[in-house]
Amino acid sequence: MLRQLKSLFEAPAPRPLPGFERRHLQVAVAALLHEARRADYHEGNDEYALARAALADLFGLEGDDGVAVLEEGRARAEQLTSFYAPVTIIKRDFSLGERVRLIEHLWRVAYANGELDPYEDHYVRKIAHLLYVPNTQSMLARNRARA
């Protein structure tokens, strides 16, 4: 009886994501990275390399796996009419720390060509807001990305 009562107040153990859910999360992140790449209407090789690095950092995706997820994310981003679907998946499956890391990667993509376009700035701030990343955390991530 005491054990059951105690279990009510303990945090549940994090459950590993099944393969298909993990893939949806990866594609959602890739779609947001693709949108960051094209926010200034110029998609460069540096931005692509940073998007691949983001997937490697966040999910351990390298090589052909990373390219496939980025391509699937690009296709998904082309069909998006709002950011609701990818943002909902990311909010559900990423902790705050992981969402801050994602925002830092989005800032890196935005700064890939050495300058920040106003459209890129607006995009990353908007996504940070939708992901419930506090503004202070987003700005600290921005400073780390710029350094």
Model feature map: region roles:
Residues 1-147:
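Small-residue-enriched hydrophobic alpha-helices in membranes
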